[in-house]
């Protein structure tokens, strides 16, 4: 399953090629979009990108955990966590891609 990792620079290059902005403007656009998404998540807002995914922040209460080495009980403090839920559209695209690669003799 491993493969290439998509980076900010890759996104900026894709915007440059597809939209026609300069490389600098493309990089600034990618940064602005990612910054807005990050700020919304930090504020506790749900970010829903249709046909892609939903990012949601939720609170977790304090609970008792266990140190796997010693077996000792330890408190896990309350915290906020982000969840990522892919859309059905994205899930189906991944499934189709996997099925197509298997049909072509891939893994």
Swiss-Prot record:
Record-level Gene Ontology MF annotations? DNA binding; structural constituent of chromatin
Report the Gene3D superfamilies cross-referenced here: IHF-like DNA-binding proteins
Key word Secreted present: no
Annotated Gene Ontology cellular components are: cytosol
Swiss-Prot/TrEMBL keywords? DNA recombination, DNA-binding, Transcription, Transcription regulation, Translation regulation
Checking CDD domains in the record gives: IHF_A
Please give the biological process terms from Gene Ontology that the record holds.
DNA recombination; positive regulation of metabolic process; regulation of DNA-templated transcription; regulation of translation
Database matches in Pfam families: Bac_DNA_binding
InterPro entries, A to Z? Hist_DNA-bd, Histone-like_DNA-bd_CS, IHF-like_DNA-bd_dom_sf, IHF_alpha
The task this protein performs is described as:
This protein is one of the two subunits of integration host factor, a specific DNA-binding protein that functions in genetic recombination as well as in transcriptional and translational control.
Question: What do we know about how this protein assembles, alone or with others?
Answer: Heterodimer of an alpha and a beta chain.
- HAMAP family cross-referenced by the UniProt entry: IHF_alpha
Which protein family is it in?
Belongs to the bacterial histone-like protein family.
Q: Per its record, how is this protein called by name?
A: Integration host factor subunit alpha
């Amino acid at each position: 399953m491993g493969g290439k990792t998509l980076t900010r620079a890759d996104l900026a290059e894709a915007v440059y090629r597809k939209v026609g902005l300069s490389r600098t403007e493309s990089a600034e656009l990618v940064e602005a979009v990612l910054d807005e998404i990050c700020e919304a998540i930090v504020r506790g807002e749900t970010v829903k990108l249709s046909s892609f995914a939903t990012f949601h922040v939720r609170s977790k209460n304090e609970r008792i955990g266990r140190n796997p080495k010693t077996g000792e009980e330890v408190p896990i403090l309350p915290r906020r966590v982000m969840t990522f839920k892919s859309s059905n559209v994205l899930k189906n695209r991944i499934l189709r891609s996997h099925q197509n690669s298997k049909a072509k003799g891939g893994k």
